[in-house]
Amino acid sequence: MLWVWQSGYLLVDLPPPKSEWAAEQAGFSDASLDGLTGEGVRVCIVDTGIDLSNPAFNGVEIVFKDMIGDSLTPVDYGFLAHGTLMAGLLVAQSHQVGMAPNIDLAVVAALGDDGNGKNTADEAEVAQAIDWCIDEFSADIISLSLGGTQTDGMMREGPSVSVTRKAVDMGIYVVAAAGNDGGLADDGRVSVPSNVDRAISVGASTKGGQVWSNSSMGSQTLANGEQRTNPNLKPEIIAPGEFIISTGRGDTWYSSSGTSDATVFVTAALALILEDQPNMKPKLNSDGSCIDMVKEALRLSTDGGGAVHDNTAGYGELHAGNWLDEIRNLPDCQ
């Protein structure tokens, strides 16, 4: 199966503007997050790769795995360096400092430019990349700014779903994009593998907190006819995903829109939380129960305490500080 992932991009002039409003809107300026940088948290991005030539990456060290070619050094195969944009939101060290700049980061190249302005991948390669994040990198969080279309079965057990289920059942957090087919073209389902119950499916919001027009709708009915239950209604959350400034190749910067960007905001928030609450990290023989607690805290952290779920807005918009506050009130996860 061929996956196509398309986001909106706009090259910005130097010196580039900043999108600090987005981090503020998502609750990253909350006092409860003071001093947290993601240190000691292992994050694995599966994307188009990364181009470290942007000066904002000076001093950044990553682990790189190439599922497309045989490069031993970091490379970005994507249209407009999609993976580089996503990584910059996390670990850029200058101009617009990333939201979790001290994480231990791995980037796996599994998507590439199809020559028509889209990034494509074979689902089997994406699944292999996720498996590498699990078995070789020992990730705490796997960040997937990508996705594929669900079949009529809606919970299709393709390779990406299977390996995502493997990850979350081991207590590894998977944050995945809900998809960019919102509006008239919406098929009413979030992308694969964000449809997996314990994965966190992320939609996009605008400046001001409204649902971005192309953010995908979720269905709450499983293939067997059963209904999803809290805290796993899809999508779970929205986060800023419109006109987000981040790193490109060389000294370029881009404005990007889509659920890809929104996914990274949730990944960053979760990295800060796991630094603060290391008992919530995956452990030997973890069974996913910590994820259940963290996702319930995410639901409760939204406006209204997650009492209402919307098929596009989820439980509401991310507020990183509120999420951490909810988790601090939980008992330790064993």
Description of each model-found segment:
Residues W5-C44, I68-F79, W212-S215, S219-A223, ...:
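N-terminal domain-start motif of subtilase-like serine proteases
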Residues D34, L89-Q93, A129-E136, S145, ...:
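Structured segments of extracytoplasmic/periplasmic soluble domains
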Residues D47, S191-E275:
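Extracellular S/T/G-rich loop segment that most often corresponds to the catalytic His/Ser-adjacent loop
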Residues V108-G112, G241-N311:
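Hydrolase catalytic cores
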Residues L111-R198, N232, T247-V264, H309-T312, ...:
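Substrate-binding/access-modulating region of protease and related hydrolase catalytic domains
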Residues G49-L52, M67-G69, L111-D114, G147-T151, ...:
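Solvent-exposed loop/turn segments at secondary-structure junctions
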Residues G179, A320-Q334:
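Secreted peptidase-domain scaffold signal
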Residues S32-V43, I50-V63, P74-D122, F137-D140, ...:
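Subtilisin-like serine protease catalytic core
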